[in-house]
Structure formats: structure tokens, C-alpha cells
């Protein structure tokens, strides 16, 4: 998920999304250990989504305003 899409969500929705990502990462790791993981790049994507969500939550905590790039 892109950062712009995540910034449109409120804190409660972001925390729910963060929980979903952690659960997905857990399941992906479990599949990897069992040898059933077919989408080998997915754990990396989920970890990056977690980092994006945590960054946005921290920005809001500190009151940092992010400029939109306009791309």
C-alpha cells in the first residue's frame, strides 16, 4: 500500500491495518518454514508496509506535516 493511501486513514484504521500486516507476516513466515511459500517476495512487501504504517503513526505523534509531492 502506498504512503499516500495510508495517510488518508485515521489512526484507528492504521492500527488495525498494522495488526493485519503483522498477522500476515506471521503466516508468511510459517509458510516459509513449512516450505509452502510460493510468493517469496511477499514478506518483504509486508515488512515495508509495516514500516510505512509505523512511520505515519510516529509522524502524527510528533505533529509532523508531510508535503504532498504532486506526482
Curated annotation (Swiss-Prot):
InterPro entries reported in the protein's UniProt record: Ribosomal_protein_uL29 (IPR050063), Ribosomal_uL29 (IPR001854), Ribosomal_uL29_sf (IPR036049)
Entry annotated with the keyword Ribonucleoprotein: yes
One annotated GO molecular function: structural constituent of ribosome
Domain of life, source organism: Bacteria
Keyword Protease annotated: no
GO biological process: translation
SUPFAM superfamilies: Ribosomal protein L29 (L29p) (SSF46561)
Keywords: Ribonucleoprotein, Ribosomal protein
GO CC terms in record: cytosolic large ribosomal subunit
HAMAP family: Ribosomal_uL29
Family statement: Belongs to the universal ribosomal protein uL29 family.
Protein name: Large ribosomal subunit protein uL29
Amino acid at each position: 500500500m502506498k504512503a499516500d493511501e495510508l495517510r488518508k486513514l485515521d489512526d484507528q484504521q492504521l492500527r488495525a491495518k498494522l495488526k493485519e500486516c503483522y498477522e500476515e507476516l506471521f503466516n508468511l513466515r510459517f509458510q516459509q518454514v513449512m516450505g509452502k511459500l510460493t510468493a517469496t517476495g511477499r514478506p518483504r512487501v509486508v515488512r515495508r508496509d509495516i514500516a510505512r504504517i509505523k512511520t505515519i503513526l510516529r509522524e502524527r505523534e510528533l505533529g509532523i506535516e508531510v508535503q504532498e509531492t504532486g506526482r
